[in-house]
Amino acid sequence: MNFENLLIELGTEELPPKALRKLAESFLANFTEELTKADLAFKSAAWYAAPRRLAINVTELAIAQADKIVEKRGPAVSSAFDAEGKPTKAAEGWARGNGITVDQAERLVTDKGEWLVYNAKVEGVETKSLIAAMAQRALDKLPIPKPMRWGSSKTQFIRPVHTATMLLGSELIEGELLGIKSARNVRGHRFMGTGFELDHADNYLTLLKEKGKVIADYESRKALIKADAEKAAAKIGGTADIEDDLLEEVTSLVEWPVVLTASFEEKFLNVPSEALVYTMKGDQKYFPVFDEAGKLLPNFIFVANIESKDPAQIIAGNEKVVRPRLADAEFFFNTDKKHTLESRLPSLETVLFQQQLGTLKDKVTRISALAAFIAEQTGANAVDAARAGLLSKTDLMTNMVMEFTDTQGTMGMHYARLDGETEAVALAMEEQYKPKFSGDTVPTAAVSCAVALADKLDTLVGIFGIGQAPKGAADPFALRRAAIGVLRIIVENKLPLDLVTLIAKAQELHGTNLSNANASDEVLEFLMARFRAWYQDKGIDVDVILAVLARRPTRPADFDSRINAVSHFRSLEASSALAAANKRVSNILAKVEGELPTAINSALLAEAAEQALAAKLAELQPQLAPLFANADYQQALTLLSSLRESVDQFFEDVMVMADDEALKNNRLALLNNLREQFLHVADISLLQ
């Protein structure tokens, strides 16, 4: 079998930067799926992407499909020949359809009889005749929400396409992609590079870089930008703030990255750095620079898409562009400082949170009361919690947050400090929204936790209370994120809070707003479902989660302790046998009619094995009681694992359902007592 390397490139107008990686990865995944379906062997495959191109490279691709032997089964021998042994019309028709005579057919014997069969050799199709159609199907399946047309063509794609190149080794593959005929011409950088004729698939990256002035390898371009930005920051005694999301976007915006350093007036540093960083990152795609102490420097790093003879001119241009945005931030900050956050409370009455749940003023009133309630249970300062809850949304009415929306909470913190609020109140203003995304940190300050929980629970109970629970993928109020936030805050801070109590208080504060009588139960179920999903994402086995869920613990911190304990129990040698024994006990007890016996009469313990089990339980119970009381479930299950030998011997020697009613009930009481000890933690009978 011979092999060649394949190169496919699509030359386009500027592709959406935030979609570039996904488009390229999907193109590659779709195409390699096509190769697999076509039984075309290859060694490896890679994708390339730049603002004006998508490309894939397949190494050591078979130049043709392998020949195949295809078994074509005909009629059964019993119906293929008549009484005189002559072929029937059915046999002749089948043979004729396969281009053979009946005499040329072979016979296949199976357990269901004997059949005529023809093993036809099917020659593999040349790869070059398949590539264009496969590439087109791969493009057709790309995740493009809003495709567009261009010119007079009816072809649709995410952006207009100008060139298509398909090379198998040095051979140009004929065909079209998105209405563009395959050709060797590859476009270079819009200003710096030249177009060229690609002679061989292997030369794509090299020629594109040397002649086209385009670094098509996305990961190489990204690494180059990061390294150069870090060097540039170090030269001015700082560290560049290079978040991966912004780095990805910048990488998707440039074909030939040139990293430059610029500056802005130091007077702007009087504005909270978060606002300056927001506009530098969000609006301008710049990398801010911080000193060793984490203080923002009056510099920024940006990436040009051209190697200029006069870089100072490009630097000056970017400084000129960013200055008005920084001046806006300065103006908003100075204007906002003239009014306290408390003075903005009346304006919250003009903003609707939700038609049935009232205004933002109504919401902060509820948050304030609920935050104080939570603070009392966690030992936090309830006065600060109530104050922070009341002010929690006031910064939404400031000029700064209206213009730079992502600074909500953060600017509230700065304004609260300027107003003379306590540090706990100020910090809660910022941390109320945490965690904002998967992997984000949770608030740790006690008042911040109370306010963050109150905000999320108020939304959850309110939206469920008006019958607008999330359905399918739709979640307009981000309730799934709120639910995970509630659970993470409680678990990671080990807060002694009960979900039932919190939900009931939130429901009480909503008063007559809620129309759904089942809201509290639905919110609890929703939180439990999020709990399960969260633990599954962390790699916890489903049966461990179900074993704990069976006990319906409604204190998240306690729930987490049980999960950890059962996970540890699974690692013990005795766990499988005890889980099986618990399942057996559960099945026996489930068949008992009426109330289960609980009192164990030692005088009725007739067999040595039941005496030993009862004695072992009696020995363990004084040790277990304080462990259960202190939620030391891991140690409790470790102690219970010592029951394995006694339990195994019991089931080997003792007939539980004895004819003697007193003996039977006493043994049932013993098993019930055994099971109850495990149920203090989880239903381990559900462990697989």
Swiss-Prot record:
Pfam family, one: tRNA_synt_2f
Protein location: Cytoplasm
Tagged with keyword Ligase: yes
PROSITE patterns: AA_TRNA_LIGASE_II_GLYAB
Primary localization class, coarse: cytoplasm
Entry's EC annotation: 6.1.1.14
Gene Ontology CC entries for this record: cytosol
UniProt GO MF annotations: arginine-tRNA ligase activity; ATP binding; glycine-tRNA ligase activity
Xref: InterPro entries: DALR_anticod-bd, Gly-tRNA-synth_bsu, Gly-tRNA-synth_heterodimer
Keywords, sorted A to Z: Aminoacyl-tRNA synthetase, ATP-binding, Cytoplasm, Ligase, Nucleotide-binding, Protein biosynthesis
GO biological process terms held by the UniProt record: arginyl-tRNA aminoacylation; glycyl-tRNA aminoacylation
UniProt enzyme class: ligase
Catalytic activity: tRNA(Gly) + glycine + ATP = glycyl-tRNA(Gly) + AMP + diphosphate
Assembly information from the UniProt record: Tetramer of two alpha and two beta subunits.
NCBIfam families: glyS (TIGR00211)
Annotated family: Belongs to the class-II aminoacyl-tRNA synthetase family.
Designated name of the protein: Glycine--tRNA ligase beta subunit
